[in-house]
C-alpha cells in the first residue's frame, strides 16, 4: 500500500502553533503553489481537525487524506483551481 503522505510537492510543519496560525500558514503556502500541487501539513493543534477540512471545503481544495488519531496530525491537500 502506498503512503499518500510520502511524496507531497510541499510540506508545512505547523507543530507548536495554535489557532488561527496553522490555517493562516496553510493559506499563505497554498497561494504560492500551482493548481494540482499537494501540500502535507503536520500539526498538533486539536483545532486543526476542524479547521483544515473546513478551509479545504471553503477554498475548494481537495483534502486527499488526513490522519488525526495520534499526534502529530497529518493532512494532505491538493490545490484547487
From Swiss-Prot:
Q: How does it assemble?
A: Interacts with IscS.
- One GO cellular component term, please give it: cytoplasm
What molecular function terms (GO) are annotated for this protein?
A: sulfur carrier activity
**Looking at the keywords, is Cell inner membrane present?**
no
The Gene Ontology biological process terms listed for this entry are: tRNA wobble position uridine thiolation
NCBIfam families, A to Z: PRK00299.1 (NF001423)
Indicate where this protein is primarily found: cytoplasm
Q: Which organism is it from?
A: Enterobacter sp. (strain 638)
- The record's active-site residues are 19
Q: What does this protein do?
A: Sulfur carrier protein involved in sulfur trafficking in the cell. Part of a sulfur-relay system required for 2-thiolation during synthesis of 2-thiouridine of the modified wobble base 5-methylaminomethyl-2-thiouridine (mnm(5)s(2)U) in tRNA. Interacts with IscS and stimulates its cysteine desulfurase activity. Accepts an activated sulfur from IscS, which is then transferred to TusD, and thus determines the direction of sulfur flow from IscS to 2-thiouridine formation. Also appears to be involved in sulfur transfer for the biosynthesis of molybdopterin.
Q: Where in the cell is it found?
A: Cytoplasm
Transmembrane ranges? Answer: none
- Give, as in the UniProt entry, the pathway in which the protein acts: tRNA modification
Listed name of the protein: Sulfur carrier protein TusA
- Annotated keywords: Cytoplasm, tRNA processing
Q: Which family does it belong to?
A: Belongs to the sulfur carrier protein TusA family.
Stored Pfam families = TusA
Is Cytoplasm included in the keywords of this UniProt record?
yes
